A protein has these predicted regions:
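Glycan-recognition and catalytic cores of secretory/periplasmic carbohydrate-active enzymes
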Residues: 1-474
Length: 474
């Protein structure tokens, strides 16, 4: 994701100016507390953007813009960070902030549908309809409310979060759905950022609270979703979230066939309908067909079509391996085929062949956030470590942690933030953000994971887009 606005722009700190092949600034943690202290310093900085209301708390950096409630870059994502702080530290103060943030989200999720708010989200990304989706829209708020209901299950607040999440579900089933040839849909884009993510939210809602009628709705939406897959002349089936009228195709997780395959795997898991498993396999065939060999392994290009086709390889969550690796990981739990572990190994090899995580490249520019950089990579490789205990995955995640610590900017008051380039095509423009996918909240959450890993008590409850075990294999 590369939006055009820049919040609190800064001159590049030493080591964070972009150059291909250049090493990122790094600092190796001496003990587990280094990770926790960095995360707590980030919390102090995020807290400076806190706004109290009678209905709860929201966080906002730029008062001239509409309040961003999204999971991706707004208040719901910051509330999710406070949930994680609560789970890791047990702090009553952080628990109260999480509750207040969730309460505000529960009361105001419909604000994302207001014309000014919807235009703000859609125009910022240049993708009409993202305000309806999961990451940047209503569904993402719902996912965080589900997590809040789980974390605070023994609290009276849990019922409030459950009711709000179910209201969001009814918004999707009763208000905003359109009728297609075989079932309901919303934006017409299969991307996980759009309709694919809405369906993941509905699956999470069904599995958390139970509702047979909702399951039948999901089945109908799944039948419609299959219509968006097209036989590719390259091989396999392609779900192009960029849109059928665009001259290019994004194959990776949040927009492309990797994300669609991931959703289809979940649809197979909850319905048992073998059509979904077969089409998910065909998505993998497409990804295999467009993968580009590296000195070691393979990588999927950021984009198919255009002058830079097959030349730029993102390594983060949205268009890169940190997201795409989730597809073969989930498939490996459902389909007894060695191709899935092979795919994981090849993509990891390809990333290291480009110099990751220590060195900058066209697809890992001077950025460290959860969406595009090291925070998202560390999270995914920690997840892989939870599956098989491979020292390789743990070491890769720790190396990413070195970059997160090394690129941190500490302020005079002891708080900390991360200046980095949001836009790949403008690496000279740095900003410091608070969001989960695009800023300090997500980076600090990954640091909490590394803290628990080093303390040998790793436990990470996961959202539905996150297929890894909650704890390492013992």
């Amino acid at each position: 994701m590369c939006e055009t606005c820049s919040i609190e722009s800064n001159q590049a700190p030493q080591g964070m100016a972009y150059a291909p092949g250049k090493p990122f600034p790094a600092h190796h943690a001496q003990n587990a507390s280094d990770y926790l202290n960095a995360a707590l310093s980030a919390e102090r900085w995020i807290a400076t953007f806190e706004h109290e209301t009678p209905e709860g708390i929201f966080w906002q950096q730029d008062a001239s813009q509409p309040i961003d409630l999204s999971l991706y870059s707004g208040s719901a994502g910051v509330a999710y960070f406070y949930l994680k702080l609560t789970e890791v530290t047990g702090s009553a103060e952080f628990a109260e902030k999480a509750r207040c943030g969730l309460s505000y989200a529960a009361a105001h999720w419909r604000d994302l549908l207001l014309p000014e708010q919807a235009a703000f989200q859609d125009n910022r990304e240049g993708v009409p309809g993202v305000h309806l989706g999961a990451h940047m829209g209503v569904g993402g708020v719902g996912l965080v409310l589900i997590e809040g209901a789980k974390t605070f299950a023994e609290s009276r607040d849990a019922e409030k979060y459950r009711r709000a999440a179910q209201a969001i579900g009814r918004f999707y089933t009763d208000e905003s759905a359109q009728q297609g040839e075989s079932g309901p849909y919303w934006t017409g884009s299969p991307a996980l950022l759009m309709d694919g993510g809405i369906m993941l939210f509905l699956i999470a809602l069904y599995e958390t609270f139970g509702d047979q009628q909702l399951l039948e709705f999901i089945k109908a939406a799944g039948a419609q979703y299959l219509h968006w897959g097209a036989e590719s002349p390259r091989g396999g089936i392609d779900f192009n979230g960029a849109g059928i009228e665009t001259p290019f195709d994004w194959p990776n997780f949040a927009f492309g066939s990797a994300g669609s395959g991931y959703l289809l795997a979940h649809l197979f898991r909850i319905t048992g309908d073998a059509r979904y498993l077969e089409v998910a396999r065909r998505c993998a065939d497409f990804l295999d067909a467009v993968a580009v060999p590296q000195k070691r392994g393979k990588l999927l290009p950021h984009k198919l079509g255009g002058d830079d086709e097959f030349t730029v390889f993102y390594l983060g969550y949205c268009h890169g391996i940190a997201g795409t690796l989730r597809f073969p990981t989930l498939m490996g739990t459902l389909d007894n085929d060695t191709r899935w572990t092979t795919m994981v190994d090849q993509l990891a090899d390809g990333a290291e062949a480009l110099g990751a995580p220590e060195h900058m490249s066209a697809g890992l520019w001077n950025t460290v956030c959860y969406c595009c950089g090291h925070a998202g990579m560390a999270h995914t490789f920690l997840g892989l470590y939870c599956i098989d205990g491979s020292p390789r995955w743990r070491e890769f995640a720790t190396r990413c942690g070195d970059i997160l610590l090394g690129s941190m900017k500490t302020h005079a008051d002891g708080s900390a933030s991360w200046p980095f380039a949001w836009e790949r095509v403008h690496p000279e423009e740095l900003s410091q953000r608070i969001g989960f996918y695009d800023g300090a909240a997500g980076i600090a959450s990954t640091l909490l994971e590394l803290f628990m890993l080093e303390r040998d008590d790793y436990h990470w409850p996961r959202m539905i887009d996150d297929p890894f075990p909650e704890e390492p294999r013992r």
